[in-house]
Amino acid sequence: MKKLLIISLCIAACNSQPVKRYGMITGLKPEKIVEYKQLHTAAWPGVLRKISEVNIRNYSIYLKKIDDKYYLFSYFEYTGNNFDADMKKMAADSTTQRWWSITAPMQIPLPEAVVEKQTWTSMEEVFHY
């Protein structure tokens, strides 16, 4: 029984992918807060499926008001081997494209994201425990 347990643990450990954590930020138009929350309360199954297919897990989005502006902070973990290729797969997905065509106009990209023609800006991880 001990050998079986050890082998099972080894298989689980050997097959696990390294996890890379991502934090991203963007602005949110105040008049779109309710609609944005409603959309995410009933996120489309096809969008959620694609998120899983491209090796993203533990995906969360938070809302914070700072002064008179609203910001979205997202956190997710990536377990794949080629982030750029997986993000291209997500961007090529027609359901995801439709979702983004609704959500992107609600958001206010930070200046850095505008230059890069993106909506979300990556954040630097400064601590993890």
Language model feature labels by segment:
Residues 62-66:
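Short beta-strand micro-motifs enriched in acidic
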Residues 19-33:
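Terminal, regulation- and interaction-focused segments at domain boundaries
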Residues 50-57, 77-119:
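An amphipathic, aromatic/His-enriched active-site/gating alpha helix that lines ligand/cofactor pockets
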Residues 32-57:
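Short amphipathic alpha-helical segments
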Residues 70-74:
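A generic structural motif
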